[in-house]
């Protein structure tokens, strides 16, 4: 089998969730971190497809869990973006780099806060030392994202409370100098404004 055919077979095995085929390709000498045209490794493909047993197998076999594809996805960031708590719990013990950025310059907790992924946010805050005050490319912290980009509903209120309880700075402004409290009030998110006030905003 040619090297190219072996790579194709390996990445297809990840796509299909076929551990035996992954194992066979590795035994034939395929590079575990080889990528397709989108710069996706087998572990990124398996993560996107929710083939959890394959992800576990590839971690145990030494796959690079931090390598990112051309849209900045890696297993850790995929779990945060897609609300995949199972994947997150598989990846965290492998000690992923929590400072890897999404294509918008956020860390994992940034999109999770924005999208209302309560359990992901809770897991990150309770199990990791991820930077709760990281500022992304547009100048927003996870707290600002949780307020500005969503509907202010129950999930967002819970996320705001979790962030504040774990050290989110209620005084960090956006790039226009607006505080979380000002933004919450502008949007009519009174419950979030109350949480911010209780946290000393």
Predicted feature residues:
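Ankyrin repeat domain, specifically the short helix-to-loop turn at the C-terminus of the second helix
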Residues: 23-31, 56-64, 89-97, 122-131, ...
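Intrinsically disordered, low-complexity regulatory segments in ankyrin-centric signaling systems
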Residues: 1-28, 37-40, 60
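Conserved ankyrin/ankyrin-like repeat signature
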Residues: 21, 53-54, 86-87, 119-120, ...
């Amino acid at each position: 089998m040619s090297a190219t055919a072996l790579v194709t077979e390996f990445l297809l095995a990840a796509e299909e969730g076929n551990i035996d085929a992954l194992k066979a390709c590795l035994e034939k000498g395929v590079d575990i971190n080889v990528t397709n045209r989108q710069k996706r490794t087998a572990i990124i493909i398996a993560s996107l497809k929710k083939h959890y047993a394959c992800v576990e197998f590839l971690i145990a076999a030494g796959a690079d869990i931090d390598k990112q594809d051309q849209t900045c996805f890696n297993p850790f960031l995929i779990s945060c973006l897609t609300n995949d708590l199972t994947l997150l719990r598989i990846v965290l013990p492998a000690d992923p780099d929590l400072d890897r950025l999404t294509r918008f310059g956020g860390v994992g907790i940034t999109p999770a806060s924005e999208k209302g992924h309560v359990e992901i946010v809770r897991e990150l805050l309770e199990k990791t030392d991820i930077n709760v005050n990281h500022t992304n490319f547009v100048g927003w912290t996870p707290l600002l994202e949780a307020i500005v980009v969503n509907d202010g509903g129950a999930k967002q209120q819970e996320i705001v409370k979790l962030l504040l309880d774990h050290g989110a700075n209620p005084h960090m402004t956006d790039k226009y100098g607006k505080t979380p409290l000002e933004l919450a009030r502008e949007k009519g998110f009174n419950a979030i404004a109350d949480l911010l006030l209780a946290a000393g905003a």
